[in-house]
From Swiss-Prot:
This is Lon protease. It comes from Mycoplasma mycoides subsp. mycoides SC (strain CCUG 32753 / NCTC 10114 / PG1). GO terms for cellular component: cytoplasm. The gene is lon. One of its GO terms (molecular function) is serine-type endopeptidase activity. Residues 19-213 form the Lon N-terminal domain. Residues 612-793 form the Lon proteolytic domain. Pfam families: AAA (PF00004), Lon_C (PF05362), Lon_lid (PF22667), LON_substr_bdg (PF02190). Keywords: ATP-binding, Cytoplasm, Hydrolase, Nucleotide-binding, Protease, Serine protease, Stress response. HAMAP family: lon_bact. Induction: By heat shock.
Length: 796
């Protein structure tokens, strides 16, 4: 038994540590080196796991006294070791674990203990002493020069580091040089670790050079020389490794050979399976030829070469693409209607158009025709509508996100000769679908962009055009693929961003934002049920009142869809579950007060109409990405020289509208009872509140005109009126967009009467009936009509 390094002369030890231990068979590792070692014993594997889980990947490596002892006693372990960091860990098929160890510190072990089938070392790490005096440095330099001159040992690298005065690096370099030397005995390595000065290590290096290849150095009478090298093994290994190194080398070699053989056997077996499938299944002849050609190349190539991997991946892809597999469609319009109604509230026109499309498809048995494209803001149900259509038709559903795609190869794939090449997104999605007739959702098709790597929109044209997609060409598979049985549906947020060539082949279905009433129905009939089901709650445990839904919709969300609404409902459900599990409550009825308690203070405040009718203040109607809102416009006059000031972060279009409105009022001042001289004696200030929010658009013309007339004639405008429409210099009122959203916001804000362009009368049918019931909508074609209603009829 060797209890080595109980005392080391002149060494100051650092703090005591406790770390798990792995035991090697006759292999002793030097500091500042790294090695990959394989461990198979249970205690060592347990120690590796403990190191990774509890000790920040630190572990102590020690050697056992006898390499032949399978389970050495703690007394048969050396009391000197190294502390290592685990960096790579791999588990082999036979259960052994291969790890890469980086050795950085030496440790004197005071005691070994065994806990939970893991060996732990309790000891103190210690460091080497670096030279401080000139005399010490001179001796080191002399030793290096002696190695060079007398013993023909190349010390140029050591001298270079010495001249840099980097003694830490010099110390590490000596360890690394000795570690790479063949047949360094275990005893020598132990003595090297015991040594704490660079000069002592250089003396050991000199002994190794002088006595190679038989070098063994005795360890201060404290260490037995048990690292005898078997002569027969020395002969076989040509004096390059000792017994323990040979055993490790052979084990590692056997494992690698076994892995290679297993890989080759599995490849051969897989290729045989592919050949059998080609014989039994109806692959197209041209596809069979390509696959068989690649299989033959694999069989003639050197195993493990890069070309084999390229061909193997190609064969795997070609065999996994659905060349003939199809799902059976459901042709039942009533069932389709039931599915759409089940998953979506409202959207009457959208559902009608979808049913019409499916009816034509069922009648003609063809998918030719425009590609359905859902256009609308985020969260209004574009993707879920596509899923519902897939369910109604019994089709597999696959989705490809095109947002941010700039490279044509994303669509058509890379040629297989490139490193890491693979098919494009279309073929990849078909592989996931496992049938050649899925419903294919092209999400955010308006977000594609072109650059110097090609134009993905042009590639998408080949995908979507029925005249071209019968022979879609993917660069990787190098075989035409028939996409004519695929049903494509696209989604977009903005029509204007869709490439023109694609837009020409699309049937646009607009999904506008939901009204507050629709959101409440969706929350009650869909979202709440979904959340209760996901959280395994019952309606008896958690119930929302209509007032609670209204509170969340108005003051905690500002969106066109219902995603944020769903998140807030889920937040309340989670907070309730916490209280439920803590035993604080057993059920909860969510009211306005509970919403504020669970979600905190209001996030949004909707703009309300003015409390009083005022001079120079008129309510306009705006359309935003979140739906509609009202837009108060203020005009004030004061003594000046006829200047016009615009504030409120207005866009260029809105600034032009203000200029046109002022010009129109000046040109028709007599009709409005305004003195011509007044314009020269005053300055006019137009302001749109919430100055930090950008505002633009062409629909504020009649609102600006009315506010100017009110301010100049000192006539108030009723607080119950709202209006929208652009104006020309001749006083014509031009049509606007977003009438549905604007009408909803007007009713929500408490307005009773709105004026709209007469050319928008056709859009009134899109306004929800519940809004029409509380809001009077009057069309106007010229500004005289507006003036008549606002200033004449209203003041009588």
């Amino acid at each position: 038994m060797l209890q080595y390094l109980k005392k080391i002369k002149g060494v100051s030890f650092m703090k005591t540590i406790k770390l798990p231990v792995v035991v090697t068979r006759g292999i002793f590792i030097l500091p500042s080196t790294s090695k990959t070692i394989e461990f198979g014993r249970v205690k060592s594997k347990n120690a590796l796991d403990a190191s990774a889980d509890l000790y920040n990947n630190q572990i102590v490596v020690v050697s056992q006294e006898s390499p032949l002892e399978e389970e050495p006693n703690l007394e048969h372990l050396f009391y000197l070791g190294t502390v290592a960091d685990l960096s790579v860990k791999k588990v082999w098929k036979d259960g052994t674990i291969s790890v890469e160890l980086n050795y950085n510190q030496k440790i004197k072990i005071d005691e070994f203990v065994e806990e939970d089938n893991i060996i732990y070392a309790i000891g103190s790490v210690f460091e080497d002493k670096l030279p401080k005096t000139d005399a010490q440095k001179t001796k080191i330099k002399e030793a290096l020069e002696e190695l060079q001159e007398k013993h023909s040992f190349n010390t140029s690298e050591l001298l270079l580091v010495f001249n840099e005065n980097d003694f830490n690096k010099l110390n590490s370099l000596i360890y690394q040089i000795i570690d790479k030397m063949p047949l360094v005995s275990l005893n020598t390595k132990l003595l090297l670790i015991q040594s704490t000065s660079i000069l002592e290590k250089l003396e050991l290096l000199k002994e190794l050079i002088i006595n190679r290849p038989k070098s063994t150095i005795k360890l201060n009478n404290n260490l037995n020389n048990n690292s005898t090298v078997d002569s027969e093994i020395n002969k076989k290994l040509k004096d390059k490794m000792d017994k323990q190194q040979k055993e490790y080398y052979l084990r590692e070699k056997m494992r690698i050979i076994k892995e290679e053989l297993d890989d080759e056997n599995s490849d051969a077996s897989q290729l045989d399976k592919y050949k059998k499938r080609l014989e039994e299944e109806p692959f197209p002849e041209s596809v069979k030829e390509k696959i068989l050609s690649s299989i033959k190349r694999i069989e003639t190539m050197q195993p493990g070469s890069a070309e084999v991997n390229v061909e193997r991946n190609y064969v795997d892809w070609m065999m996994s693409i659905p060349w003939w597999e199809q799902s059976e469609d459901i042709d039942d319009l009533k069932y389709a209607q039931e599915i759409l109604e089940k998953h979506h509230f409202g959207l009457k026109k959208v559902k009608e158009r979808i049913i019409e499309y499916l009816a034509v498809k069922q009648k003609t048995k063809s998918l030719k025709g425009p590609i359905i494209t859902f256009v609308g803001p985020p969260g209004v149900g574009k993707t879920s509508l596509a899923r519902s259509i897939a369910e109604a038709l019994g089709k597999k559903f696959v989705k490809v996100s095109l947002g941010g795609v700039k490279d044509e190869s994303e669509i058509r794939g890379h040629r297989k000769t490139y490193v890491g090449s693979m098919p494009g997104r279309i073929i990849q999605a078909l592989k996931r679908a496992k049938v050649k007739n899925p419903l294919f959702l092209l999400d955010e098709i308006d977000k594609m962009a072109s650059d110097n790597r090609g134009d993905p929109a042009s590639a998408m044209l080949e995908v979507l055009d029925p005249e071209q997609n019968k022979e879609f060409s993917d660069h990787y598979i190098e075989e035409p693929y028939d996409l004519s049985t695929v049903m494509f549906i696209a989604t977009a947020n903005y029509i204007e961003n869709i490439p023109e060539a694609l837009y020409d082949r699309m049937e646009i279905i607009n999904l506008s934002s939901y009204t507050e009433i629709e959101k409440m129905h969706i929350a009650k009939d869909y979202l709440t049920k979904k959340i209760l089901e996901e959280d395994q709650l019952t309606e008896d445990e958690l119930r929302f009142t209509d007032e609670a839904y209204d509170e969340i919709i108005k003051y905690y969300t500002r969106e066109a869809g219902v995603r944020q609404l769903e998140r807030h409902l889920a937040t309340i459900a989670r907070k309730f579950i916490v209280k439920l599990l803590n035993g604080e409550i057993t059920n909860l009825v969510v009211t306005r007060e509970v919403v504020v308690q669970y979600l905190g203070k209001h996030i949004f405040e909707h703009t309300s109409k003015e409390e009083e009718s005022q001079v120079g203040v008129v309510t306009g109607l705006a359309y935003t990405q979140f739906g509609g809102d009202i837009l108060p416009i203020e005009v004030s006059t004061y003594n000046g020289k006829g200047n016009l000031t615009l504030t409120g972060k207005l866009g260029e279009v809105m600034k032009e509208s203000a200029t046109i409105a002022l010009t129109y009022v000046k040109a028709n001042h007599e009709k409005f009872g305004i003195s011509k001289d007044k314009f020269d004696d005053i300055d006019i200030h137009i302001h749109v509140p919430e100055g930090a929010v950008p505002k633009d658009g062409p629909s504020a013309g009649i609102t600006l005109t009315t506010a100017l007339i009110s301010a100049l004639s000192k006539q108030p405008v009723s607080k119950d009126f709202g209006m929208t429409g652009e104006i020309t210099l001749r006083g014509n009122v031009l049509p606007i967009g977003g009438l549905r959203e604007k009408s909803i916001s007007a009713a929500r804000s408490g307005l009773k009467h709105i004026l709209i362009p007469s050319k928008n009368v056709k859009d009134i049918e899109d306004v929800p009936q519940e809004v029409q019931d509380v809001l009077k909508i009057t069309p106007v074609s010229k500004y005289e009509d507006v003036y008549e209603i606002i200033f004449k009829n209203n003041n009588q």
